[in-house]
């Protein structure tokens, strides 16, 4: 009887994605420091710092924004910034898709499972066309930069490119290569 290799049961595309994911987990530590990505433990546990504000479809609770309509919760700050109880401190980091994946691993280890890059449709729900100069509700997402943010979605028309949503214009673009550095906002299902 011929021995079958483990990967023989999976299509080639699945093998590539699995190996890419495995490489990220085994890879050396991210150059992005974990403490620069996440809120401080005091900000997460101090009830006095937890604020609930209802704004349209969003409910804001400390470092999270809960999207009541779509059943997801967003990090209030961009990756690299830290929620201090009233705004986002620090510099939002522009990351490649590979480094964004490493930041997601850190977020899942420190804040619980499920954090990921948003889909194109999910990120587009944050666009506020009436808002200026940044096309997002700054009450819910303070200190957001008027720049593109990654989605986790490949452009089906140009498979070497990833979709982004630009919060300066409110438009979606599918022209960024995964090796380019773009801002990141994480989301997870509720």
Question: Where are these predicted regions, by residue range?
Answer:
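Glycine-aromatic-enriched surface loops/turns that form tight recognition elements
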Residues: 2, 6, 18, 30-116, ...
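Bacterial N-terminal signal peptides
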Residues: 12, 16-28
């Amino acid at each position: 009887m011929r021995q079958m290799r483990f990967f023989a049961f999976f299509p080639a595309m699945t093998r590539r994605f699995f190996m890419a994911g495995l490489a990220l987990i085994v890879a050396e530590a991210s150059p992005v420091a974990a403490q620069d990505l996440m809120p401080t433990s005091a900000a997460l546990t101090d009830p006095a710092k937890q604020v609930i504000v209802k704004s349209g479809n969003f409910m804001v609770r400390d470092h999270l924004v809960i999207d009541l309509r779509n059943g997801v919760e967003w990090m209030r700050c961009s990756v690299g910034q830290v929620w201090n109880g009233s705004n986002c401190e620090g510099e939002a980091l522009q990351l490649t898709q590979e480094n964004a994946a490493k930041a997601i691993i850190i977020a899942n280890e420190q804040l619980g499972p499920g954090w990921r890059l948003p889909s194109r449709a999910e990120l587009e729900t944050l666009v506020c066309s009436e808002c200026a100069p940044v096309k997002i509700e700054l009450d819910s997402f303070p200190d957001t930069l008027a720049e593109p943010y990654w989605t986790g979605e490949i452009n089906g028309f140009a498979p070497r490119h990833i979709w982004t949503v630009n919060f300066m214009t409110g438009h979606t673009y599918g022209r960024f290569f995964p090796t380019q550095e773009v801002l990141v906002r994480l989301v997870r299902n509720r």
